[in-house]
Swiss-Prot record:
Organism whose genome encodes this protein: Xanthomonas campestris pv. campestris (strain ATCC 33913 / DSM 3586 / NCPPB 528 / LMG 568 / P 25)
Pfam family, one: Lactamase_B
Molecular function terms, GO-annotated: hydroxyacylglutathione hydrolase activity; metal ion binding
Family, similarity comment: Belongs to the metallo-beta-lactamase superfamily. Glyoxalase II family.
Protein name: Hydroxyacylglutathione hydrolase
Enzyme Commission number(s): 3.1.2.6
Record: residues binding Zn(2+) 1: 53, 55, 110, 127
Record-listed Zn(2+) 2 binding positions: 57-58, 127, 165
Amino acid sequence: MRLTALPAFDDNYIWALVANDGRAVIVDPGQAAPVLEAAQREGFTPVAALLTHHHADHIGGVAELQQHFPALELYGPDDERMPSATRHVAHGDTVTALGIDFAVLEVPGHTRSHVAYVGDGHLFSGDTLFSLGCGRMFEGTPPQMFDALQRLASLPGETLVCCGHEYTLANAAFALHVDPTNAALQRRQQEAQAMRHAARPTLPISLKSELATNPFLRLHTPEIRAAAAAHASISITSDVDVFAELRRWKDAFRA
């Protein structure tokens, strides 16, 4: 089994999990061309697609892929904005493909029906969890997004996080602004800079690393709580309120 990150648009990743027999699971194919080119180059055939949410940069390539692979199974949340999902999934469901059981987790916040998939030691988090950051809340509330991130944070530390975008360096700038003395975060930024300089993805990354470096997963720590309270100029007592302030801060942040 091999995992490949297929770049799409300016900063998206389409994930391809390819079995030894050439069958593949594709995650969030926002464009068809990167998948078709990789399938021809590497000799794999997509048999299933896991869709995390309805945004076009995550599902825009589905129709063309169906033309090339008519037997393609399409899994996604039950959302009228995702007519491409032919097999609806919900929290607690299991999707079996390539002999792998992918657990479905509801993670609303970025969108109201967003889901994530966990299987074969990988977390496909869509736009909920990024390396060193998290997604914007276009439809959800801070408590929903907080709960979603806590759900993902509870997975085993060796889980490899496969995000929907290459946002690591931009997120690192904010994370270091909030948590400037975090040595693990400083190392992660340096490693990510070297990876991008070599035109390599900064993903996947272990959840253990994210728990040590991602401010949105470190809301309980004195450093993050103090930074959020100082920015808000008020006393903040709950982790949800710390998250809400941190997300507002990130939305307005310019490096």
